[in-house]
């Protein structure tokens, strides 16, 4: 049915209910289902050609059978004696076979047959004699065939009540159709009609009509003759206007007018007082149709993807509204009266320009489906709105209790390669110092030239850029060393200003992809539409001409990269459009077709993503700003630029967000002595601070949740291990992360030796006096620690007690260490290697694995820790392999974090730098990452398993949770373009270097009914079992986002 794939409408239930009614009537009949001997199960019209048509023999004694199902048998003829043997038959199902015409034997059943289903065949004609004989027929399904016309004899079926001729090639309908006076349901969608068939105007009993996806371009004025019509589908009918007579269809209850060219509705539209469901999505409405406001009985209203700029206050008159979709318009504000729609259960507002939600929004407490992303929200803040209506209600309640407060504070991130000059630039900006002060300058802030400061990893500084306006920057200096790449994405967040620092003294055009291009791709993938300023440092080391040429080259190559990416995405979007223009049946007919077998719903999702990527390109400020830290004019110009951009309300609306004063006070109290020095606070400690801020316990939760979402502190209400603690000291946490990601063996060994010198003297511990160690003991201890450092840098392995030594003095008590390790595991940075799930370690040493440190490319058995070994993989019949491809950029640290995320799903694992061998139960799985090899071979990440064909469900069961975990992680990169494919099992078995790739969207679709095998396009003689392409049950393509720790402290 038209629109069934949209997933946005509940109207599918209308057709489902009709099917259930028919099934209920059939349930009292004596039924029989037959399968042809030797036939491939489900070898229907869409299946492969078989050498011989399967034969089906009727059993004896069929005289009492009233319902016979011969569907999914690949039949070209019905069995001999069908008509004479079935004297009582009332229902005959022949769907999904290979009939080119209605079998003559069907005519013999005409005097008692009431229901006939010949859908999904190859009918090009019906046969006048056969149709004439079906005089008792009440229900006829001819959908999904190749019929160019219908015979006139169809009009003689006086008892016909339901007729489905959708998905055919009908250019017109026979005049005799007007004689079907009892017809209640007619489906003609997806045909080739060029005008509304006037014959239908005579069908006074018609209640349900679908003429979607035909090029009608208009409706007749006298369509009002269809007075019994209750359900009308006109989706994608190329309608520009509705005639006044349309408004006389007074019985209409459900109306689908989506995907047309409507700009307005007739004033008389308000006469449709029985209307309960209306879909006007994907039209050209610039104003909310006033004619809808008097429709007091309306329950569902869809106005997605129009050009609306406002919603009228009189919408509150739609008091029975349960569903309201207004997404992807240009709405700037909502009327206060919208909160009176207290019965709303679905409210979709994403993709608009809404900055402020009305007061008392929490009254919409019944809303379950809530979408608000991609709006410039200020009040409530974006982080609050994304949590849902209860959190919005708590925010507004708190705002009413305490005076509002505005905090102009912007996150500024300095990015760039190692030695780009980020740290020196940060010092000069935040301390307002000038190195050397050539040509004058403020002597009080003038410092003699000094060696470039050495970065200590990721550093955070607060910078009051303009005290008079109270404007502050929180400056994050992101380390340029590759070892920090796994944690850098945690700090890339919406609402921040990105400064990409390039060393102009060493820059060469051929190095653009690594010094500039890759950083832009990275930020764009993580934070679509981010604001980026390019700053060139060491300008004093370049000649005037050289400086100009290098800045112009960076500017030119950025423009070329953006143009290349946008054109590539446009081409891909065009392929999706072309696929959507073809019928699903046509797409599914040939594996050679683009997006073979992909549903309209998945194609529309794909198209929407491409459109999102095209509409949310990076905002790159031009031109490149050359800076020398020795020139106060350069620094002043850079400061002025940053301030002018920061104060632009349309670019950074969050800078002006309004908070309850009590929430701001709670934040400030967390950072005052004595608690400011502690690594974490208990929930009760925070509750006591909340009372000082005027927050009762029931109001504290929302405040902590906001501070967590906005990156001020970490509070994991969804984690049993962490929910009783609040991590407020983010500076110390970053210092701890820096310890793990400085890959200097001498520095690590020095920290361990310092840690051992104070061992046994930690706070809260007591120990007897220790004798001074002998030189030989000191040497032995140093040797052991050196081995631990080597194991860490080569294999990413550290025992818990060594981690404690490494983190002194940051971690003192054992509880600090345990909480910190739980936190690192939640961030996806490490996992406990030998801890039984849900059980204590019974005194044995806990070992932790940091996958980003693994150096050996091929996994090896770690039997020296867990006593297991990975047996060699034996030959098996069939392979499953899901491959993710990343054409533009591969997310930083994704493989390492994914390695941690899957740990709870696998056992007996062995890790390499780019590969993981493991088991799901007794089923082997292999996760592999292959870095890009040039422009034409992108980065890929694959998940594979294998099993014999009868047991292939076990392989699907093994890899499906791993696929879903990867999908969850990729949700953190909304601007990332990637593709998913199922690799052909036959190609893999042959060892093909370039196996055929079936579309990954098939993973989220049910197996096609009646299809047993699929042709591999790489080799037309190869047939792939459908079980090797489609999972037993569809996977979750867009799983609900899990709480990610890394997401939270990146949002400050």
Curated annotation (Swiss-Prot):
It is found in: Cytoplasm. Ubiquitinated. Ubiquitination by PJA2 does not lead MFHAS1 to proteasomal degradation but positively regulates its function in polarization of macrophages. LRR repeats lie at residues 64-85, 88-109, 112-133, 136-157, 159-180, 182-203, 205-226, 228-249, 251-272, 274-296, 297-318, 320-341, 343-364. One of its GO terms (biological process) is inflammatory response. The modification N-acetylalanine is found at residue 2. GO terms for cellular component: cytoplasm. The gene is MFHAS1. Residues 64-364 are annotated as: Required for interaction with PJA2. This is Malignant fibrous histiocytoma-amplified sequence 1. Keywords: Acetylation, Chromosomal rearrangement, Cytoplasm, GTP-binding, Immunity, Inflammatory response, Innate immunity, Leucine-rich repeat, Nucleotide-binding, Repeat, Signal transduction inhibitor, Tumor suppressor, Ubl conjugation. The modification N6-acetyllysine is found at residue 601. Residues 403-649 form the Roc domain.
